[in-house]
A protein has these predicted regions:
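Right-handed parallel beta-helix
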Residues: 87-88, 126-137, 161-176, 191-204, ...
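Acidic Gly/Asp/Thr-rich repetitive segments characteristic of extracellular carbohydrate-active
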Residues: 38-74, 115-118, 491-495, 502, ...
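Bacterial N-terminal signal peptides
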Residues: 20-34
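Short boundary segments that mark the start of a structured unit
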Residues: 549-684
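Acidic, glycine- and Ser/Thr-rich low-complexity intrinsically disordered tracts
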Residues: 59, 102-104, 112, 279, ...
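Short glycine/acidic-rich loop motifs that flank beta-strands on beta-rich extracellular proteins
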Residues: 71-74, 98, 113-119, 138-148, ...
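Right-handed parallel beta-helix/beta-spiral solenoid domain characteristic of secreted/periplasmic
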Residues: 43, 69-70, 76-145, 171, ...
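Ser/Thr-rich, Proline-interspersed low-complexity disordered segments
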Residues: 520-552
């Protein structure tokens, strides 16, 4: 067996002194051996595109680790079903997921050719492997839409025959720069594609949605496994634009063992914030996707910015109105950890914005939700069908579940909430316009199961029988503070689930699915080494110094009160934010409203914005318009929340509750089950 080696460089690698006879022999040998797979070496300065063009199926193109190759590069269509491999000369030294610290082992592919991707596929290109490459632009000033483009999302790809397929991206570092604006790491509009062991970072822009990975015009299947994934708006999204291929739904998507991560240096007000306010939305969003397995991942860091901070969103959208077949269905979300976010999972069945698209058949099981902020663990909008929420352990600040629907929306069916452990915080299961507990479930779903859940600290009479309300401190976690959510042998929830398993998460199953993946550490400054002090002679006594004035306290921003009350006919309510401590220089804080029982559409005017304090200013007001309706609905509430700050700290309180005192009179209606009395069922 002969394996040939070709050198592709700036100069001819075959010496001109070779005799014609030897050259002919070499050519014949090359022809014979390439059928078995040639190794094509492209040293620094060589033409990688020429090597790609000349490669045959089965060939391996080796590029020098540490060398830079200038693109853009195109993977052309070739006949044959053996892979053409493009890999670093030191790829074998990288085991598992690559990291930026291994840059020296990677060959560097760069481009600054307008908005062209560094690597793209030709129509129908197939059977390529990319291994051990660093893919980026030359400088932070180079704007680019896609660093890697697999397939096309426009009308040039309007039927399945032109879709690239059988593509493998392995141990790649795909990245922008800290201050750079670019739209996508990988544009994923291909078929049969694997992205594995890679590191995608610094994908962000201002006032533009950006994604580390985004696909909308490829059929799948996709395998996204063991990657570090950073994207400002959405780390991964499927949908978001209408497919140009009729009836296409990205399908058979496997997302396993990844770290979905947003650096806190992107967060306004964090000590590590770098001063660029990127558009931040969520960590994973499905708008058009079918048969999706999301298993064994970690979702870390998401906050209020362009959206409410919910990290996982399932919301079917016929985005541009030309794809009424769009769906989000048959999604499994299992063995994941969601940590340090404002909420959990939001599921929207359909809406006017969805233009007919439907979300259904979602299973959320055996996950941990921890360090969840003031928003809700789960949000169900417009009554999605066949939703299962089972065996989760949830530590949250907001409601367990908030349910809401547009007027006239039919009730949902097949809701199952079972065998979960829910911490204190917020309300339990809350139905907008109805209240808490069984009435909320019955008001929005014609069939449901709510059993063997522990809703810590809630009132049992509001809920169906067969549930518990034990405080989290009495659940019997092995080490709640340390993050070990296994149950002790004496826990009342040990082996007490519907299936005979522990109520809440099976930690062993979760860790087995996550493997070696771990949350990213919180960055801490490198300590300055302390020099060994030089011995000093015994000092001569000196007079006591004049006392130094106490240092000026750093500025903090907070509401003057944690609660306000306003009559419905008052027209507006004014809330005051104060700056205490130093008032030198400017400072700012963002604010946003959050519905509790009041609606930002029909009861008050929902809002978000930024308060900026000039030097010397110590207070600012926020005025909120109140709607004076004629509906008998009882008192209703909403929150105003302070979040990102600049040149100050957040004080306390940062959340204030506004109660709108109803001024309408009418007949009270008694809801028999749960003993809840309301003025009128009001659906928004």
């Amino acid at each position: 067996m002969f394996i040939s080696q070709i050198c592709v460089a700036a100069q001819n690698c075959v010496s001109p002194k070779l005799t014609n006879a030897f050259a002919i022999f070499f050519s014949l040998l090359l022809f014979a051996s390439t059928t078995l797979g040639a190794t094509i070496v492209v040293p620094a300065g060589g033409s990688l595109q020429a090597a790609i063009n000349s490669a045959a199926p089965g060939d391996t193109i080796v590029v020098d680790a540490g060398a830079t190759y200038t693109g853009p590069f195109t993977l052309p269509l070739k006949s044959g079903d053996a892979y053409i491999t493009i890999q670093s000369s030191r790829a074998s030294e990288i085991t598992g997921r690559v990291s930026p610290s291994q840059s020296g082992l990677l060959a560097k592919l760069r481009s600054n050719f307008g908005a062209e991707p560094v690597i793209k596929t030709a129509a129908g290109a197939h059977h390529y492997k990319l291994i051990g490459l660093e893919i980026s632009t030359f400088t932070a000033s180079d704007f680019i839409y896609d660093l890697v483009r697999l397939g096309n999302g426009d009308s040039s790809q309007s039927d399945l025959s032109t879709v690239p397929h059988h593509l493998i991206l392995d141990r790649l570092w795909i990245h922008g720069f800290q201050s750079q604006e670019l739209q996508r790491g990988i544009s994923l509009n291909s078929a049969e594609t694997t992205i594995i062991n890679s590191y995608i970072s610094e994908i962000h822009a201002i006032e533009t949605d950006t994604q580390a990975i985004c696909g909308w015009n490829g059929p799948g299947p996709y395998h996204i496994i063991n990657n570090h994934i950073e994207g400002a708006a959405e780390n991964i999204m499927f949908g978001g634009a209408d497919p140009k291929i009729p009836n296409l739904v990205p399908s058979d998507i496997e997302i396993r063992g990844n770290l979905f991560f947003k650096p806190l240096s992107w967060k306004v007000g964090d000590p590590s914030y770098l001063g660029r306010r990127w558009t931040i939305k969520n960590l994973l969003e499905l708008k058009n996707a079918r048969r999706v397995t999301i298993d064994g991942n970690i979702f870390q860091n998401n906050w209020v910015e362009a959206q409410a901070g919910t990290p996982v969103v399932f919301t079917a959208r016929n985005q541009d109105g030309n794809a009424p077949w769009s769906v989000v269905e048959d999604v499994t979300f299992t063995n994941n950890t969601v940590t340090n976010t404002q909420g959990g999972v939001s599921i929207l069945r359909t809406s006017a914005e969805s233009k007919g698209a439907i979300t259904s058949r979602i299973r959320i099981s055996n996950n941990v939700f921890e360090k969840i902020g003031l928003f809700d663990a789960f949000v169900l909008l417009n009554n999605p069908n066949d939703i299962q929420i089972t065996h989760n352990t949830v530590f949250k600040g907001g409601n367990i579940i908030t349910i809401d629907a547009d007027p006239g929306t039919p009730k949902g069916t097949g809701l199952v909430i079972r065998d979960n452990l829910f911490s204190e915080g917020g309300y339990g299961v809350f139905g907008s316009g109805i209240g808490e507990g069984a009435p909320a479930l019955e008001g929005y779903f014609s069939s449901y199961v709510y059993s063997k859940n522990n809703a810590a600290g809630r009132e049992g009479f509001m809920y169906p029988v067969g549930n518990s309300f034990v405080l989290s401190s009495q659940v019997g976690f092995v080490d709640q503070a340390g993050g070990n959510y296994r149950l002790t042998s004496s826990s009342p929830f040990k082996n007490a689930g519907t299936d005979g398993k522990d109520i809440g998460v099976d930690v062993n199953e979760l860790l087995a699915a996550q493997g070696t993946i771990a949350p990213a550490p919180t960055p801490t400054p490198t300590p300055t080494p302390t020099a060994t002090p030089t011995p000093t002679p015994t000092p001569t006594p000196t007079p006591a110094p004049t006392p130094t004035p106490a240092p000026t306290q750093p500025a903090s921003l907070q509401f003057t009160s944690s609660a306000y009350s306003v009559h419905e006919n008052a027209g507006s309510v004014t809330l005051t934010v104060t700056r205490t401590g130093s008032t030198a220089g400017s400072a700012s804080v963002t604010y946003s409203s959050l519905d509790v029982t009041a609606s930002g559409f029909s009861d008050y005017t929902g809002l978000a914005g930024t308060l900026t304090f000039a030097a010397g200013e110590s207070s600012k007001n926020v005025s909120i318009a109140i709607v004076n309706d004629t509906i008998v609905e009882g008192n209703e509430t909403f929150n105003l929340i302070l979040s990102g700050v600049s040149n100050a700290n957040l004080g306390s309180p940062t959340v204030t509750t506004v109660t709108i005192v109803d001024n309408d009179k009418g007949r009270r209606v008694k809801i028999p089950r749960g003993g809840v009395t309301i003025e009128r069922r009001k659906v928004r």
